[in-house]
Regions:
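Alpha-helix C-terminal capping segments
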Residues: 39, 68-75
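Short loop/turn motifs at secondary-structure junctions and domain boundaries
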Residues: 27-30
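Compact, glycine-rich, soluble single-domain proteins
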Residues: 50-64
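C-terminal binding/interaction regions
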Residues: 5-24, 68, 77-158
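Basic polycationic patches enriched in arginine
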Residues: 1-2
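Short strand-coil-strand connectors
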Residues: 41-42, 131
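Short beta-strand scaffold segments in enzyme catalytic cores
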Residues: 33-40
């Protein structure tokens, strides 16, 4: 693995923020709650939870909700890391399970666009609803040779 930065070696707070966000998931169809937490360059954190819709294609992933929140705050280019957790909800709506969750392909692409705006290769902390298991990646490992604005001849402004 690559040399670890502080954000890579201390994911506990970011994972905890993602777990707290997952408690706000609206997942009545899959009963699979996902939480995401974005670490911004100033140390602040923006979170999101998945929002399902009866028209399944309109559902929103937790990472996309968090990225949209960062964008609404004018902070899209400030994202340096993301933590994602998920699990099946128990009867009280609390996510459970020790299976490590990764961002889906769509979310990887959305995160990549934000990463390019900030000129960063985001750190991605993949965790579980319960337990201490965390797998850490660079976004470029999860989305190699990514398609982005440059492929369309667009130069990103920071």
């Amino acid at each position: 693995r690559r040399a670890m930065t502080e954000a890579m070696t201390q994911p506990a707070a970011l994972i905890a923020a993602a777990r707290a966000a997952a408690l706000n998931a609206h997942a009545p169809y899959s009963r699979f709650a996902v939480g995401a937490a974005l670490l911004l360059s100033d140390g602040s954190v923006v979170t999101g939870a998945n929002v399902e819709n009866a028209s399944y294609g309109l559902s929103l992933c937790a990472e996309t909700v968090a990225v949209a929140s960062a964008s609404a705050a004018g902070r899209l280019a400030d994202i340096v890391a993301v933590a994602v957790i998920g699990g099946l909800m128990d009867t009280h709506g609390v996510p459970t399970g020790a299976h490590v969750v990764n961002p889906c392909g769509r979310c990887r692409q959305v995160l990549n666009e934000a990463a390019q705006m900030g000129g960063r290769d985001l750190i991605v902390h993949c965790g579980a609803a319960e337990g201490d298991a965390v797998v850490i990646y660079r976004l470029s490992e999860l989305l190699p040779d990514a398609f982005g604005p440059a492929d369309l001849g667009i130069v990103q402004r920071r």
